Amino acid sequence: MITVIAGLRERDRCARIQTRHISNSNDCASTPGIGTRSLACRAILDNRNVTGTVSAAQPQLVIFDLDGTLTDSADGIVSSFRHALGQIGAAVPGGDLASQIVGPPMHHTFEAMGLGEHAEAAIAAYRADYTTRGWAINSLFDGIGPLLADLRAAGVRLAVATSKAEPTAQRILSHFGLNDHFEVVAGASVDGTRAAKADVLAHALAQLQPLPERVLMVGDRRHDVEGAAAHGIDAVVVGWGYGQGDFADTGASSGAVHVATIAELRRALGV
C-alpha cells in the first residue's frame, strides 16, 4: 500500500481539508511550490482518500537519489569507511553502519564523530579508497533499469541528485549504463561546499530550467524528503534503501509517499 501522510509545508492545510472531507479543489488550487500541488491535495482534487492507496498524476520530472534508491552501494561505502578509520587509528562505531553512514555527506559523518584534527585525513583516506575500489562494490536494485527506460519512454524527464561527489556519481551511472537516461546528474562538489541535499537539489534544479508543473523526488532517507520540501517538491520514499530508521517516528515521514517495492513505485510514478 502507498500511504500519503499529509505534512511538512502543508500539514495544517491538508489536515483541515481531510477533517472536513472536502471533495473539491477550492482549498488546494493555490498550493505553493514549484508549480505543483502536494500529493495529499492532489488526491483530494481527484476525489481520493489521502490516507489510503493513492495513484497520483504522472510526474513530468523525477529526480532520483542514488545510494539506497537506484544502487545497493552499502558494502563499498562501509568498506571504505572502515579503511579510512583504520588509516587514522580510530575505532569503528558499533551498530548497523549502512543505516548510519550511507546517504548523508561523508565529510559531515566524519566531522560528527569528533575526530578533531584527524577528520580531514579520514575524509582524504575515504575518498582515495572509495574512488579506487569502493565505488565498484555496488549493484543496481532489481527493476531499476526497466523502470528508468519506461519512464523515459513515457516522456518523463529524469535527473539524479545525490550527496555523493558528482564525478563519482557520474562514474557509477556510466558503469551501469544509465547515464543516457538522465538529463542532469547533480552531486556534491569535491571540495564539500555543496553537499547538503537541499543544496544539491538547488544545483540540479538550476540546470533543469524551465521546470514542469509536476516534479517529484525519489529517495530513501529523511534528508531526501527534507531537501525536496525545501524546494516545494513532493517526495516518494523507497523501502529497500538504508533509511528505515529515519521514519520510525511518523512525524519524520510527513509529506512523503512510502513504497515498499518497485511495483509500488511504478504505480506512484504512473508507469
Model regions and ranges:
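Acidic, Mg2+-coordinating phosphoryl-transfer loop and its flanking beta/alpha structural elements
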Residues: M217-V257
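Structural recognition of alpha->loop->beta junctions
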Residues: G177-V185, F247-L269
